[in-house]
């Protein structure tokens, strides 16, 4: 029997970034079956990894300051680690007893900056075969989601279209009426998911903004998950869906980590860095470039909606193409 191989992984604080690097943990688990994991994240990123197989401990450290690193060192210094993976790029691994380490380094200034999945893969020299984002969900989490979904069960239930209309900034929010048109096309009588259901994901605060979307189909075809499922439960729910359409948001990253076809609607954010990953991940944007947005909103933080010029027809066509291309 192979000896236990303890791995310490310091995850990114930003949950979206932690999701984009999550495939590294899956690769480690699959290639080192005897590995056990201690994961370090922030309040926002750590809960996404609570169902990681062979998880010894899940620690929360908010900042990257020396004081925070000392607190973390004091909690993990007694262990001799087989591998330390530091996705925040700190100097902590130099203070620990370990056989190997992989530490994020600044991307070379003379090289074009690639997608964040590739950036994360480079930490472990996997940039030629970057592992796709993936979040593990346990049988317990799956059972919780099944219980939630049972509230909406009815005979002849069809495939589920997930819509994520929220985002963490109004500048990235495509209008709900436009999402409603996308959902109506896919789920309507002549659509490819005419027998399907509509799942709306997001925070409780997003519920009001989704009114037009939920009115797209009959009430009994709508599954309301906003504010009812936490983020990892939402990922488990998304694993049960046929496809997803949403803004650049945590929900779009969760859909990518669920392994389903994903269409992201982008405006003042860069899909070449953070767009849905993989052959079944696609992005649509309007005519403006990132430089165009920054001329009007230099720090990309003003209370301005930048998404009005993303045309409905372009998103509808992309959604129909994604559905057709991923049809079994």
Regions found by a protein language model. Name each.
Residues 1-328:
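Catalytic machinery of carbohydrate-active enzymes
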């Amino acid at each position: 029997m192979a000896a236990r191989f303890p791995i310490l992984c310091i995850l990114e604080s930003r949950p979206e970034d932690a999701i984009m690097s999550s495939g590294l943990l899956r690769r480690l688990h699959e290639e080192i079956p005897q590995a056990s994991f201690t994961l370090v994240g922030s309040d926002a990123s750590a809960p996404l990894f609570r169902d990681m197989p062979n998880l010894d401990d899940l620690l929360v450290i908010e900042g990257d300051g020396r004081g925070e690193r000392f607190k973390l060192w004091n909690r993990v210094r007694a262990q001799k680690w087989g591998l330390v993976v530091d996705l925040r790029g700190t100097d902590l691994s130099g203070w620990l007893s370990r056989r190997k380490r992989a530490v994020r380094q600044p991307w070379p200034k003379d090289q074009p900056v690639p997608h964040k999945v590739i950036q994360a893969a480079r930490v472990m020299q996997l940039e030629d075969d970057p592992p796709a984002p993936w979040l593990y969900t346990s049988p317990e989490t799956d059972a919780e989601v099944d219980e939630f979904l049972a509230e909406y069960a009815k005979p002849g239930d069809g495939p589920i279209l997930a819509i994520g209309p929220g985002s963490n900034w109004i500048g990235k929010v495509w209008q709900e009426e436009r999402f409603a048109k996308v959902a109506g096309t896919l789920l309507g009588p002549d659509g490819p998911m005419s027998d399907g259901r509509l799942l709306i994901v997001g925070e409780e605060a997003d519920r009001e903004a989704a009114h037009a979307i939920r009115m797209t189909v009959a009430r009994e075809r709508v599954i309301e998950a906003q504010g009812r499922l936490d983020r990892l439960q939402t990922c488990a729910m998304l694993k049960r869906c046929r496809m997803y359409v949403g803004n650049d948001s945590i929900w779009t990253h969760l859909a990518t980590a669920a392994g389903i076809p994903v269409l992201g609607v982008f405006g003042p954010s860069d899909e070449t860095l953070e767009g849905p990953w993989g052959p079944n991940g696609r992005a649509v944007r309007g005519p403006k470039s990132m430089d165009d947005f920054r001329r009007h909103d230099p720090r990309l933080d003003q209370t301005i909606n930048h998404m009005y010029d993303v045309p409905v027809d372009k998103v509808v066509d992309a959604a129909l193409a994604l559905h057709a291309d991923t049809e079994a």
